[in-house]
UniProtKB/Swiss-Prot annotation:
It is found in: Host cytoplasm, Host perinuclear region. This is Protein AV2. InterPro entries: Gemini_V2, WCCH. It comes from African cassava mosaic virus (isolate West Kenyan 844). Belongs to the geminiviridae protein AV2/V2 family. Interacts with host SGS3. Through its interaction with host SGS3, acts as a suppressor of RNA-mediated gene silencing, also known as post-transcriptional gene silencing (PTGS), a mechanism of plant viral defense that limits the accumulation of viral RNAs.
Amino acid sequence: MWDPLVNEFPDSVHGLRCMLAIKYLQALEDTYEPSTLGHELVRDLVSVIRARNYVEATRRYHHFHSRIQGSSKTELRQPIQEPCYCPHCPRHKSKTGLGEQAHVQKAHDVQDV
């Protein structure tokens, strides 16, 4: 666990609160299996706190809030039936294009004329 007496403190009280909230959520995340809705919701809440732009944080929070309102407590620990393909999640971006860079085009052999 993060030791506040050993590590460097943030510049503001708000930064300290955010850091402590993220550390708590990371510890809470370990109590859920990686393929459950609860794990995804905790990760979404961490992304809300880490957003630097107010508009982006509000958008993420509304998305999180609608997902948490539509789920029951028993669903949080159940495996997810359908995978999430949302474009903003960094955990889903790593599944596509492993080993290939997106900006590099493949070379084609051209016959001599």
